Amino acid sequence: MFALVERQTGQVVGFGGLIHFAGRGEPEIKYALLRAAWGRGLATEAACALLDFARDRGLPEVIATVDPQHGASQRVLAKAGMERGELRDEEDGTQTQMFYWRAVPR
C-alpha cells in the first residue's frame, strides 16, 4: 500500500495499492480517500498511477470490486481505463460490481 499525499499541502489524504487475495489469480486495486479529499480528481489520479505501476511490473490484469450503488468509485475506475464487468453475487447475499483492466503494451 502507498500513502496518497496531496501535492499542495504534503498531507496524507488516503491510501492505495494492489492487493492479492489468496485464491484469486489477479491483483485487486484498492484505494480510499478522506472525505475532505473527495471530488478533486485525486482518486482517479491514484487509480491511474496504480495501473501504471501494475503495467511497469508486467502484471497482465488487475481487477476492482465496487459496491453497485457507489457511482463515484465506478466513474473513477472507468476514467482510469478499467472496463465494467459482471455483477458478482457474494456469499453474504450482497452483490459486487466487477471492473477489469488488461495491460496494453506502450
Please report, for each region that a protein language model flagged, where it lies by residue.
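Acyl-donor (CoA/ACP) binding surface of acyl/acetyltransferases
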Residues: M1-R106
